[in-house]
Amino acid sequence: MKKAQIIVDKYFLTGKTDKRIYGSFIEHLGRAVYEGIYQEGSPLSDEQGFRQDTLELVRELQVPIVRYPGGNFVSGFRWEDSVGPKTQRPSRPELAWGVIETNQFGLNEFVDWSRKAGSDVMMAVNLGTRGPEDAKNLLEYCNFKGGTYYSDLRKAHGYEQPHDIKLWCLGNEMDGPWQMGHKTAAEYGRVAAETARLMKFMDPEVETVACGSSSLEMPTFGSWEYTVLDEAYDQVDYLSLHQYYGNASGDTADFLASSKGMDDFISGVVSICDAVKAKKHGKKQINLSFDEWNVWYHSNEQDKKLEKWVQAPHQLEDVYNFEDALLVGSMLITLLRHADRVKIACMAQLVNVIAPIMTSDTGAWRQTIFYPYMLTSMFGRGTVLNTQVLTPIYESKTYGEAPYLDSVCVWDEEKDTLTIFAVNKSLDEDMEVSCDLRQFEGYKIVEHIVLNNDDLQAANTEAQPENVVPVKASAECSKLDGGKLEAVFAKHSWNMIRLAR
């Protein structure tokens, strides 16, 4: 049995968690919107056409904010097409994903849906085929009280009160040659700065997110971030990161080490942000919005066979297995370990498209990745302790030395709770883990939840929705005696130990 130690001190803190770190993402792509969150005429939908079963599962996740409407989609998005009477909304070819967009679900419907889901809106503007003027008009439509053309247009559409959207993405993945309106870093930095400036003239309370690199593998990574921030540092508030991981090679150990790659990515971008700050003698700090992250590879081959120019095809519909849930758990731990700088994060996406929730005409179900996301969202709120992990390591093909144990501790001082999240990545050995918690006098173990399965490829389906579900560990798996925690984490398992006073 492997052995490891978790070291925490309640006076050594990483930082408070921003609840938006548990955000998600809905794009007009595949069946994310149509048949996912919206299906008019379905017996499962409410009077607005919103799938009630989907809404219930989204509420279970406690998603604080949802990014919309893209994604690559936003770089060709004409927001005016998506508002007003549905009979007057045009259908258009959607170039990002090669489909037909009917615009029967649009901006106002999404705001209504978000309110029912208990989420705020993170709105993206089109800086691909459009620019600052259109972004300003969209903000006027959403946030201005009245007495102007676009605010009165919103009222005419039945929305008397402003939507009051305060978080805005300045385009999407503008470094990518696949993007409509793709730009160089200097071109994008300039238009992002001017767009943010106009938007803050209109509503000084809005926050803006500039596009960072589409992934760590982009050839322009590093220089892109530096140049964009050099142009836009004073106007923007966050810089975005996007990253997906896959296991097409079937090398599980290397796949599970991907969280180390994510950690390196975040650390690198933080360094670049601070380098620009130093150069500019800046006072404010640019924080990060990791607004696309997940596992994505299962659907790649199937998507090559899709017919083009159809409506709402089965696109990017990854069926997630147990090992995917392990990595998602580790990625959430990684985000929390950077809570001092990562203030926003969005699992991409939320329903049907590389998503924790899947739907059919007859129901909705939770994929394997749903569970670490839900439980971390529920209990990973408070202050992240500077969690040191003394763990055995292994050599991964892609990321070099990787830890067998990923872990982070979150302390909610007001509620007197301490939650330990941990992933044992060893494929063949349980792990005995100790942690000195004598500073947390009076705390007792509330529960030890474990997500585990003998079959790394086990998945949840509509027919078998509970193949992979978390369970309570036996009392022998975790004990607290004299302020010292001793726990056993099973091989290839995700764990959550909750303590409270």
Predicted stretch roles:
Residues 242-257:
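Active-site His/acidic residue clusters
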Residues 1-224, 229-238, 262-263, 267-304, ...:
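Non-catalytic accessory regions flanking glycosidase/transglycosidase catalytic cores in CAZymes
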